[in-house]
Curated annotation (Swiss-Prot):
Keywords: Ribonucleoprotein, Ribosomal protein, RNA-binding, rRNA-binding. This is Large ribosomal subunit protein uL18. GO terms for molecular function: 5S rRNA binding; structural constituent of ribosome. It comes from Lactococcus lactis subsp. cremoris (strain MG1363). Residues 1-24 are annotated as: Disordered. One of its GO terms (cellular component) is cytosolic large ribosomal subunit. This is one of the proteins that bind and probably mediate the attachment of the 5S RNA into the large ribosomal subunit, where it forms part of the central protuberance. The lineage of its organism: Bacteria, Bacillati, Bacillota, Bacilli, Lactobacillales. Belongs to the universal ribosomal protein uL18 family.
Length: 115
């Protein structure tokens, strides 16, 4: 019997492959996105020191999932700019650049982050 491929395992493989090629530095940290079934999380990470500089999530937000993602993008961009971060490397976490991930990225760009 043919078994259905586990989408999350495939996503994790993509994410691991991409993480081997990109990393955040102190000057240009990494904007990481995690998307669950109900929420979306974003954090700005300095991979050299292994610290999270800014983060935001949709845990307490209301509206559609896409609207929540856009609000998270705006919030994480504002938090990053408050820490002095202007430019980041976007890490979509193995997810397709579509829907909620694209909405988060667009809102972060509009709020002033460069990537």
């Amino acid at each position: 019997m043919i078994s259905k491929p586990d989408k999350n395992k495939l996503r994790q493989k993509r994410h691991t492959r991409v993480r081997g090629k990109i990393s955040g530095t102190t000057e240009t940290p990494r904007l990481n996105v995690f998307r669950s079934n109900t929420n979306i999380y974003a954090q700005v990470i300095d991979d050299v020191t292994g610290t999270t500089l800014a983060s935001a999530s949709s845990l307490k937000l209301t509206g559609t999932k896409t609207e929540q993602a856009a609000e998270v993008g705006k919030l994480v961009a504002e938090a990053a700019k408050a820490k002095g971060v202007e430019e980041v490397v976007f890490d979509r976490g193995g997810y397709l650049y579509h829907g909620r991930v694209a909405a988060l990225a667009t809102a972060a760009r509009e709020a002033g982050l460069k990537f």
